[in-house]
Amino acid sequence: EQMAYVGATPWHGLGNNLPRKQPIEIWQREAGMDWQILESPVHFKFDAVGHLGAIHSYPEQKVLYRSDTKAPLSVVSNRYHTVQPREVLEFYRDLTEVSGYELETAGVLKGGRKFWALARTGQGTAIKGNDQVNGYLLLATSCDGTLATTATPTTVRVVCNNTLTIALDGSSRAIKVPHNTRFDPQAVKKQLGIAVSQWDDFMYRMRHLAERKVQWHEAMGFFMNVMCEVSPTGQLPEQLPNERALRKVQELYEGRGRGSQLESARGTA
């Protein structure tokens, strides 16, 4: 069992404590989720004598195992769709980058047969004094058939198998995706009413572009690549293709274009 968390130490005192707002890649490593679920056909021996015998396969079933330790996880139907540990964390990428969610806990249970991630939604309230109740979004799944891929709002801070069970039990708003169906993160978010809108995504990209400073040689190199199909770091021809258009675009970018002198546009991407 392995997990990572931010904030208060779990009751069991285990896990890796992380600073707030760490990237998905850090969570993946510290929560013990930096491995994949691989699969192999089921094989069995026939007419075995000692260690020798004919090996046959059973095409209706497959073995799931860990890519890092090669430890077996389960035997499932060949129609079983696995959800990878990284997919559980990636579910939160746009929510944390655009919608203000913050990952709170994540980890693996039962040797990797079950894993989860939990993010704080930013909603919460204080009940009678200092009793703070926070809103979370939980995504949990298994690879042994014991748990469908389940996304649900909860007020339970999941840090172990017991708290995971409590969070999943009795949730009327849970979205469950059985393993005979492919997990579609965006469809689940839409069902929960938390999908990042096109406008939110656009604003997120615009803010990042406005913060990205661009030097003159970078801009010229980009324009030459796109308009002249010439690498600025290579040998330049005597006459640039589309040179007139290149100069026009350069002038627009450097101040003659409408809006190019705005603080969010001048010298940025």
For the regions a protein language model found, what residue spans apply to each?
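Beta-rich nucleic-acid/ligand-interaction surfaces
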Residues: 105-124
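Intrinsically disordered, low-complexity regions enriched in serine/threonine
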Residues: 1-49, 123-269
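N-terminal low-complexity, intrinsically disordered segments
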Residues: 1-109
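Generic structural hydrophobic/aromatic packing signal, biased to beta-strands
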Residues: 64, 117-119, 139
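Short, well-ordered loop/turn elements at secondary-structure boundaries
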Residues: 59, 112-113, 133-134
